[in-house]
Amino acid sequence: AFNYYGLPVYSPESSVTLVPENFDRETNQVNQTIQAKIGVESKEDAPVGYLLDLGYTNFSHKYALSKEQDGPTEHTFDVKFDLNARFGGEQRIGLGGNVEYFNYSLPTMGGQEYLEFENHAEATLSPYYKVSGDNWNLKLGANIMFVTGDNSKFMASPNITADVEVADKTELYLVAGGKLYSNSMYEISQVNRYINPTMELLPSRNYLDGTVGIRSGIAPGFWFDVFGGYKITSDEVFFAPTLLAPSVQGDIFANTSRALQANAKHAFGGVNLKYSYQQLFDINLKGVYNSWNVDDIEDAYGKPEMELTAGITVRPISQVTASLDYYLATGRKTFLGRSEGEKMKNINELNLTGTYTLNDTFGLYLKLNNVLFQKYELYYGYPM
């Protein structure tokens, strides 16, 4: 359970200041999840490979926009499958995919449903061919995806992976894929639990998610990965606070996030470094630069321009580990109703973790978050 403790954000067309005390910042929202899964899979090296997974997810919001309104419930039925056969030595041909059906139980007021969520299905079919050589691997395939309902769509994307060893412990690699993101109630709540629980989102159609790079472990204990990529997505999701007018002050929740959807192109590049010295310590450092180009909205709201992740783990004795993990995200903006985006404070967080192993069964664990006591907002209006 959690509450919408964030500060209310006023609409720029209004000259009246919103008073936080006039909104509900205390009632606990409850997002309940019930899941069941069952599946069967062949051994990895079987001449004929198969996989079948069946899943069900029941996800519900206890409330809509106030404790006086019941929230919706989402039922997801999911089937994942793969069938492939080996031939000619190290070659395989196969067909994989998944089918999801989303069904909604909606609350009523005066005998009428007051929310709009459409029952629909989403499916992906992925034919592919795999082949391996002495120092290379190749997969050629495609993803064929479609959505039913009023917003029915059909799309296709590549499904290609390749890598080749160009020197000792050094390889070039390429990944070119795509995906249909359902943006279901359950999936969006895993990203942002403060999302407006009455908002239905369109699926995001990722036509291309490509990465090329070189990675190497040529030096003892040292590993690096230099990479760059490009993504093309329709109806990408960007979070911004809901802008409120004074007339809505009352018992509604103070700050719910809304999802702005826009076509987006995302270029990125970065480097990932790791060093390990025997069993005494590990060091990792990763930096990524992001460049966004979006249609219909001014900025890629909430998305960082630069990300830096660093960590060190020390093992003074075999039973004890101590870890420091650092994350920095810069260049984020949010939408407050004006043409120019509002800059957000950088995420600047250092976490400390310690573990002590008592035996093969039991151990002790301690984690301290934000030990530098930095103030920032992961979502606008929600200070950490």
What are these regions (language model features)?
Residues 9-22, 65, 70-71, 96, ...:
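Short, flexible helix-coil linker/hinge segments at the edges of structured domains or between repeats
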Residues 43-49, 87-90, 131-136, 167, ...:
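Edge/loop elements at the starts and ends of beta-strands within beta-rich repeat scaffolds
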Residues 137-141, 145-384:
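Exposed, low-structure sequence patches enriched in small/polar residues
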Residues 3-7, 57-59, 100-102, 144-145, ...:
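Short glycine-rich beta-strand segments
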Residues 1-51, 55-76:
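Flexible loop and strand-edge segments within Gram-negative outer membrane beta-barrel domains
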Residues 56-58, 73-75, 82-92, 98-105, ...:
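Phosphate/ribose-recognition catalytic cores of enzymes acting on nucleotide-derived substrates
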Residues 1, 34-38, 50-52, 75-83, ...:
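One face of beta-strands
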Residues 92-103, 107, 116-147, 276-287:
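Surface-exposed extracellular loop regions of Gram-negative outer-membrane beta-barrel proteins
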